[in-house]
Amino acid sequence: MKEFPKNYNFIESEKKWQKIWQEKQIYAYDENIAKDETFVVDTPPPTVSGQLHIGHVYSYTQTDFIVRFQRMMGKNIFYPMGFDDNGLPTERLVEKQRQVKAYNMGREEFINICNEVVASEEEKFRSLFNQIALSVDWNLEYQTISPLSRKISQMSFLDLVKKGEVYRNNQPILWDPVDGTALAQADIEDKEKTSFMNYITFKTEANDEFTIATTRPELLPACVAVFYHPDDKRYQHLAGKFAVTPLFNVKVPLLADPLVQQDKGTGLVMCCTFGDQTDITWWKTHNLPLNTIITKKGTIDFPHEIGIDGLKIKEARAKIIDILKEQELFVKQEEITQTVKCAERSGAPLEVLTVPQWFVKTISHKDELLKRANELNWHPKNMKIRLDNWINAISWDWCISRQRYFGVPFPVWYSKRIGEEGKILYADISQLPVDPLKDLPIGYSKYEVEPDLDVMDTWATSSVSPQLSTWGISDEFAVNKDRHGKLFPMDLRPQAHEIIRTWAFYTILKAHLHQNTLPWKNIMVSGWCLAEDRSKMSKSKGNVLVPEKLLEQYGSDVIRYWSANSKLGADTAYSEDVMKNGKRLVNKLWNAAKFVSQHFDKLSDEDKKTNLIDVKEKITHEFDQWIINKLVELVNNATNELQNYEYANAMHLTEKFFWSVFCDNYLEISKTRAYDEENKNPSGQYSSVLTLYHVMQTLLKLFAPFMPHITEELYQILYSENSIHIKGNWINYGNLNYKIDAKQPERLLEILDHVRKFKAEKNLSIKAEVQLLEVSGIELSKELTSDLKNVTSAKEVKFKPTNDEIKVSILT
């Protein structure tokens, strides 16, 4: 055993161990070990999109608790770290940091700037993840924009093309006019906004007036029909007739359709191409013409004497209303609250434009995906309903093309050869990764092709995050077929609940389409980290907690302790009180270890090296045997909780045992025997010290997944030069159980509790001498009576056997 330092300096200790763990490759994955002996994690690649915050620490450490446990259980661990450094989130960060706009500069120049920013931001993540002691193997690191990742992502695309699960079509899509790109259904959020319902006068061809209601009068030039409900008796006379649009005098059909809400507005609604998804449905169902007037920049494209061409949406709306009023065609306006579909990233209200895009078939697989969700092991189980609800709500195929720069390009060109103009040309797998702006399809010259200028949705690459680590999509599309077969499907996907509809869903979809399987066996879903007042953290509120400051103040182990106190899946508020409890626990571990260590020289070297099971006969005292039984029970329960991903329960059980059973009671009760200064009870002393030795060692191992630095420091001082975190270092006491009457030691604790309360009420020191301790209702064994006398400082203990409850009389 090493000399015990006087104090614990967490800053020095944490830096020291983080360096040693990396140097000794404690967390290295061994590719030569079989799959069934390996625990494979699909680690969330953090999005390189802004400031690091305590939420990163919160969710990533919860995964690490499980990984460290699995490693100590003997599993070979595949625990990579990736960086999701391509796509719109990164582009927005770059534009903000460098005060540039992608569209105002050359594509290559902007990509170079993105690469510079990404490299700097990723280094910050690495530093933080090392500080909080994530036990990842950094040799397995990947970036979603790296050549290998681009190759895997393009393989995924080509495999889906081959399977007929991807198509390109010129159809209505959701468009973000701020970021200038198409979006998928999962990229939008519904926002409640104040708006106005505008009542406008239309006429029939016969000059009969009627009123329609709309929130978007600026779309009048795009009106292609007017609809009413087939059961609405008010408008049956309009069947088969035509309306004439105000201001523009365009003849459009009056049609019946059950999607019309009779009680909304006047029950008459114009169909424009396009205001919303209902317009799309009507356009398709009734084979209506396409009349697009909104540009990709969110302005009006409608040269007309009315003068709205080039105006922004809101400007055009106001002008149309003014002109309608001038011509007495505007009936009234009502303020309403409506749900508006907005871009999740930019916050901009979305438009529906018709632009050629790439799509992954999704709607046709909804039933299959619901079955997949049911096959998956959910932790916690109640998170499954979120995926079920999302799948049931899907109404669009997944649009995977984005009109941006910094992303994975489509391995696609379009032929300009005479006779095959527009033919889609795909890269050969041997060419991947390709950049169609620089590379060419086999057999074509640069004058014969037009490159696809779009890049893939960042989720199109993130959705193959398991495959980015396994280096393969399928047996046919693989960089390393053997590696892919050994690692896929994976064991665990940890992630936050807000991206179930994106990352979880898309990854399940891709694995299902590629290999007809789930991507992992288990999904572990974390909640949000909230501010102390339980509000969502945001820069605007000024309540974002920066990890670096907390690490300086408390250290990594304390922050991890706070994270471990949050149940999986629960949204948890940051708590200064919990942090202080964590700091108190670290100090108590140090002091308890320091106390027990002074007795370890009383043990033989052989017994120190021997497993508890093999020295159990040397633990002879009844109270020592009782705590060993309790310890075995704790190990079994904590192990079971961790195997079920209930790390918070495991932490709670361990902490409660440490404070209540070990520190508050066992240490105090066994202390006199451990010292045995007069050598009155050598077997009792040896039993006590051997018990202290193994209980402390076991507690360090139980705490190790949660608080890796303090446990490593103490373990190496007291027990071994090998890391506490090495593979196979968990506790297994099998069926170890001492045949004792457990009620006897528990009665001892009950009596002790009475004495402590008595002394506290009399303002006596806990060590104050007791002349006579008289106990009725039970009689303790000779060994336990001796312990009771020692711990209560009682000169004499008398027992009065009765059938009554325990009563304690104390004479001081």
Curated annotation (Swiss-Prot):
Example GO BP: valyl-tRNA aminoacylation
Record the organism.
Rickettsia bellii (strain RML369-C)
CDD domains recorded for this chain? Anticodon_Ia_Val
Where are the bilayer-spanning segments? none
What does the entry list as the binding residues for ATP? 539
Q: Which family does it belong to?
A: Belongs to the class-I aminoacyl-tRNA synthetase family. ValS type 2 subfamily.
Name the source's superkingdom: Bacteria
Q: Which Gene3D superfamilies does the entry link to?
A: HUPs, Isoleucyl-tRNA Synthetase, Domain 1
Q: What is its EC number?
A: 6.1.1.9
Question: Per its UniProt record, what PANTHER family does this chain match?
Answer: VALINE--TRNA LIGASE, CHLOROPLASTIC_MITOCHONDRIAL 2, VALYL-TRNA SYNTHETASES
Q: Which GO terms describe its molecular function?
A: aminoacyl-tRNA deacylase activity; ATP binding; valine-tRNA ligase activity
Motif 'KMSKS' region: positions: 536-540
> Oligomeric state and partners?
Monomer.
Q: Which SUPFAM superfamilies does the protein's record reference?
A: Anticodon-binding domain of a subclass of class I aminoacyl-tRNA synthetases, Nucleotidylyl transferase, ValRS/IleRS/LeuRS editing domain
Choose one Gene Ontology CC annotation of this protein and give it.
Answer: cytosol
Stated role: Catalyzes the attachment of valine to tRNA(Val). As ValRS can inadvertently accommodate and process structurally similar amino acids such as threonine, to avoid such errors, it has a 'posttransfer' editing activity that hydrolyzes mischarged Thr-tRNA(Val) in a tRNA-dependent manner.
Q: Which UniProt keywords apply?
A: Aminoacyl-tRNA synthetase, ATP-binding, Cytoplasm, Ligase, Nucleotide-binding, Protein biosynthesis
Please spell out the taxonomic lineage of the organism that makes this protein: Bacteria, Pseudomonadati, Pseudomonadota, Alphaproteobacteria, Rickettsiales
What protein name applies here? Valine--tRNA ligase
Main localization (coarse): cytoplasm
Q: Which Pfam families match?
A: Anticodon_1 (PF08264), tRNA-synt_1 (PF00133)
Where in the cell is the protein located? Answer: Cytoplasm
Task: Write out the residue ranges of the motif 'HIGH' region.
Answer: 46-56
Q: Catalyses which reaction? A: tRNA(Val) + L-valine + ATP = L-valyl-tRNA(Val) + AMP + diphosphate
Q: What is known of its domains?
A: ValRS has two distinct active sites: one for aminoacylation and one for editing. The misactivated threonine is translocated from the active site to the editing site.
